[in-house]
From Swiss-Prot:
<feature type="compositionally biased region" description="Basic and acidic residues">
    <location>
        <begin position="742"/>
        <end position="752"/>
    </location>
</feature>
<keyword id="KW-0469">Meiosis</keyword>
<dbReference type="GO" id="GO:0007095">
    <property type="term" value="P:mitotic G2 DNA damage checkpoint signaling"/>
</dbReference>
<dbReference type="GO" id="GO:1990166">
    <property type="term" value="P:protein localization to site of double-strand break"/>
</dbReference>
<dbReference type="InterPro" id="IPR000253">
    <property type="entry name" value="FHA_dom"/>
</dbReference>
<keyword id="KW-0234">DNA repair</keyword>
<comment type="similarity">
    <text>Belongs to the Nibrin family.</text>
</comment>
<dbReference type="GO" id="GO:0000729">
    <property type="term" value="P:DNA double-strand break processing"/>
</dbReference>
<feature type="compositionally biased region" description="Basic and acidic residues">
    <location>
        <begin position="423"/>
        <end position="433"/>
    </location>
</feature>
<dbReference type="InterPro" id="IPR016592">
    <property type="entry name" value="Nibrin_met"/>
</dbReference>
<feature type="region of interest" description="Disordered">
    <location>
        <begin position="389"/>
        <end position="496"/>
    </location>
</feature>
<dbReference type="InterPro" id="IPR013908">
    <property type="entry name" value="Nibrin_C"/>
</dbReference>
<dbReference type="GO" id="GO:0051321">
    <property type="term" value="P:meiotic cell cycle"/>
</dbReference>
<dbReference type="Pfam" id="PF00533">
    <property type="entry name" value="BRCT"/>
</dbReference>
<dbReference type="GO" id="GO:0043247">
    <property type="term" value="P:telomere maintenance in response to DNA damage"/>
</dbReference>
<dbReference type="GO" id="GO:0035861">
    <property type="term" value="C:site of double-strand break"/>
</dbReference>
<keyword id="KW-0539">Nucleus</keyword>
């Protein structure tokens, strides 16, 4: 921070800010010298430059320059300045304005601030203020530091260094107030009124002396501090060196054990900073041997917190003394104080490490190994609960841990499939008890899995133990259909039966019979697929299934043909895929929920004949009837809206066989076209007494009957805006020649014109 101090008592002191021009003059100036007549109105200009890039570089100080603009001149150290040429000033230069005794001295006070425990907003405000003041901001304490800025005093390594160097510890508001005082030309504020409060749980404001004490500069004189860790050495060695001590880093065995006999030798303990040390380094043998040797001599290691306590108390009799132990009465309080200060020195904030819990671990990952065996089911249920929130990013680690833990559980089995079966074994047994068996077929693992999936959502468990490509979940209104979905053979056959016999009315007994029939068809289709794959083991109950195999296969083939014909018919009518999807959904819903209306007797007869009698003669009859019915449906299907309205009264008896509740789709063009005019209407409008006949007459305006204006002659000369250099030069030469000719003619006339004035002689 630059300032200009007057050597005479009448003058004052002027402080300079960056980015501002200070004018020295006799009137209406920032620096007034009114009593000197040799001072001009604007005698000289002073300015300070300090780029923001030099804020963290203490070697790049701000620059004060002066520019003279006076009549009688300005001298710097006796040398007269060249007007209008600026000159940089140095600290200690003497500047004289004018020819009389207006002498001033230039002084520079470095302003290097070290910040500690400040948030981002406070740091930004501090940086802006110091840029205007021409100072610097550092993150670490150095020899050039002049102030330590803290909102509340905590015993950190920066605080210890500031106390040793006898530098003030102030709030960041001090520099804001200093900036305003310079701008308003008020007296500078006192830093003692900006000392922050003490924020240490183990220290009281009375016990912490923050005043400047010169004894702290030599607090560690003639002492040698031995560090066993490089990180401690790098952090604490500046404080020891500022206090007049010596430091050394031990990298191996002591070559001279007699060094420890010196009472001024202090070995810094590594036990208080185990969190900072790696496990391999803390167990090195030479560290252990050094500590054992020190203990054998009756000496103790020095905790790093005692360095700060020795500086605060300005004494090394109790602290940093390897031969002196703490008194028994104050041992508990001293240990607590050391814990707080050591944690503060390590981290830069006041935190008691004894209160902090150990690093948190996911203990639930080891629950399967620690709980008794009778609680295995409970732990599995917890895993299923974790699986429900598997999309949460924060629980990904716990999922992986619990997964690995469950696979190592001896009760879980060797594969994930066995574990899934064990998880829901009780539910499967309950399902077998509650669900009556419709057909006595052989139970398989797939049937058990289907039954368990129907009652409980095991898809989450499946995807948890093995990564499979899952299909998208259907809507809630189709959950029943998805859970009881049948193979393609049964679905197509049921669709064919429904197309032939639509539901009309039905009693309660027939509804139960249809549901039993659907279950029988599902189980029989599964058995047919198993037999086709090669499982030819026969049972007493397989006879009924094998009898159904022939008509079912025929039904599949005919249903495929019928569906193809239906698609062609729909394509001719320009129906969309949405119509087919609506029809299929209605059919699936009718299969699952059961028709609430009884069916007509042809369906009853055909179904019973196909399922219960199982006679092969009924299959061709049903197939022929289906084909005839399908052809009738295709032929009699309406092709337009007008035809449909015409056929409704004629085909009233056959409307029951047609699908109901369909969606009618119409395709219309979005392009608006003009209607074609009727020529007959136009011709008729011109005849007779039509009110739309034009009766007005075009009036000729003046000049309408004259000839058009023909452009020609001079109008066709091309207009070029570009300058022609040759033409301009030729014109210029012509003008010069004409002027030269006129000048010559006038000169010739003057030569040949003789009109002398008569001169009168005096007699």
């Amino acid at each position: 921070m630059w300032r200009l101090v007057a050597e005479s008592a009448a003058g004052g002191t002027y402080h300079f800010l960056t980015g501002t021009d200070y004018v020295v003059g006799r009137k209406n100036c920032a620096i007034l010298i009114p009593e000197d007549q040799s001072i001009s109105r604007c005698h000289a200009t002073l300015s300070v430059s300090h780029p923001s890039a030099n804020l963290g570089q203490t070697n790049a100080a701000s620059v004060l320059s002066i520019k003279d603009s006076s009549k009688y001149g300005t001298t710097v150290n006796g040398d007269k300045m060249n007007p209008a040429v600026p000159r940089n000033l140095k600290s200690g230069d003497k500047v004289t304005f004018g020819v009389f005794n207006s002498k001033y001295r230039v002084e520079y006070e470095p302003l290097v601030v070290c910040s500690s425990c400040l948030d981002n907003s406070e740091k930004n405000s501090l940086n802006q203020n110091l840029i205007h003041l021409g100072g610097h901001v550092l993150n670490n304490w150095t020899e050039k530091s002049t102030h330590l800025v803290m909102t509340s005093i905590k015993v950190t390594i920066k605080t210890i260094c500031a106390l040793i160097c006898c530098k003030p510890i102030i709030k960041p508001d001090y520099f804001c107030e200093l900036l305003h005082a310079i701008q308003e030309k008020r007296p500078l504020p006192d830093y003692r009124s900006f000392i922050p409060s003490v924020d240490e749980p183990s220290l009281t404001p009375e016990s912490l002396d923050l005043s400047e004490n010169v004894k702290r500069k030599s607090i560690f004189k003639d002492k040698v501090f031995l560090f066993l860790n490089a990180k401690q050495y790098k952090k604490l060695s500046p404080a020891v060196l500022f206090g007049g001590g010596k430091t050394d880093l031990l990298m191996g065995e002591l070559k001279d054990a007699s060094v420890l006999d010196n009472p001024a030798t202090c070995v810094i303990d590594v036990a208080m900073t185990e969190s900072q040390l790696s496990e391999s380094q803390s167990t090195q043998p030479w560290i252990t041997s050094t500590l054992d040797l020190l203990q054998s001599k009756g000496l103790r290691t020095i905790p790093e917190a005692e360095i700060g306590l020795a500086v605060i108390n300005v004494s090394t009799e109790i602290y940093c003394n390897p031969r002196r132990r703490a008194a028994s009465g104050t041992e508990a309080g001293t240990s607590k104080k050391m814990n707080v200060l050591s944690s503060t020195l390590c981290q830069g904030i006041a935190v008691d490490e004894t209160i902090l819990p150990a690093p948190t671990l996911d203990i639930t990952a080891y629950a399967a190994n620690t709980e008794p065996q009778d609680q295995t089911g409970t732990s599995w249920m917890n895993i299923s609960g974790v699986r429900e929130v598997k999309e949460t990013p924060g629980n990904s680690s716990s999922h992986s841990r619990s997964k690995g833990c469950l696979q190592k559980d001896p009760k879980s089995g060797s594969s994930s499939n066995d574990l899934r079966q064990t998880l829901f074994r009780e539910d499967e047994t309950d399902t077998r008890k509650n669900t009556p068996s419709l057909l006595p077929t052989k139970s398989s693992a797939r049937d058990v899995t289907k039954t368990s999936q129907k009652l409980q959502p095991t898809k989450k468990i499946d995807s948890y133990f093995q990564s499979l490509a899952k299909k998208r979940d259907r809507a809630e209104d189709e959950k029943e259909a998805s859970s009881s979905k049948l193979p393609r053979v049964e679905t197509l056959s049921s669709q064919t039966l429904e197309e032939k016999f639509p539901p009309v009315t039905q009693t309660l007994e027939e509804e139960n019979f249809d549901s039993d029939l659907d279950m029988e068809l599902a189980m029989s289709c599964d058995q047919i697929l198993n037999d086709s794959m090669g499982s030819k083991a026969a049972m007493p109950e397989d006879s009924t299934v094998k009898k159904r195999k022939v008509p079912d296969d025929h039904v599949v083939e005919e249903s495929d043909v019928d569906s193809d014909e239906g698609i062609r018919a729909n394509a001719e009518q320009n129906d969309t895929k949405s119509d087919i999807n609506v029809t299929k959904r209605r059919k699936v819903d009718s299969e699952i929920e059961g028709t609430k209306e009884p069916t007509i007797k042809p369906r009853e007869i055909g179904t019973k004949a196909q399922v219960k009698t199982n006679s092969p003669e009924m299959a061709p009859a049903i197939r022929k009837e289906i084909e005839v019915k399908k052809e009738l449906d295709i032929k009699k299907e309406p092709k337009s809206q007008w035809e449909e309205s015409k056929f409704v009264p004629d085909l009233q008896g056959e409307t029951d066989a047609l699908p109901s509740r369909l969606l009618l789709t119409e395709f219309k063009s979005l392009v608006v076209s003009r209607p074609v005019r009727n020529n007959n209407a136009t011709s008729n409008s011109s005849n007779g007494k039509c009110h739309n006949f034009k009766k007005f007459k075009k009036v000729a305006y003046p000049g309408a009957g004259s000839f058009p204006n023909i452009i020609g002659g001079s109008d066709l000369i091309a207009h070029d805006r570009k300058k022609n250099a040759e033409l301009e030069q030729w014109l210029r030469q012509e003008v010069e020649e004409q002027t030269q000719q006129v000048r010559e003619e006038s000169l010739a006339e003057d030569l040949f014109r003789y009109n002398p004035k008569p001169s009168k002689r005096r007699r």
